[in-house]
């Protein structure tokens, strides 16, 4: 499809949507962010499931719509042992939790100095991990489009985040 080897990827990590482009010696091509979809952008959302499944974009939204209602009560949760202490904050609050999370607004959270992680299933998900779910999905799309495994990435960021003085 492309002549020449790609030299870098460029990512626009947006609040709502993100995009990726492949840079060659003589040109830059924005590539579809999700295989099989006509759009060039990927929804900047991360899906987390207690079993370790991680998704980004439309796949994240679709998975959450199908599985978002599933939950565990603490009596049936492998993270909480009868009579034992637990790191699960949900167990101490209301005795149950959802099996899935759809994390939105990750870019907004980057601007917050008081936010470093979100907590689910007795574990903290660092902000960098949430961002990486989206970035890794974008990279897979660019690898598929370019036929290469490019390791060089260019990303910009706002000089000042909206709402910050």
Residue ranges and their predicted role:
Residues 26-165:
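Phosphate-binding loop and its immediate beta->loop->alpha context
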Residues 2-31:
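Gly/Thr-rich phosphate-binding beta-strand-loop-beta motif of the actin/hexokinase/Hsp70
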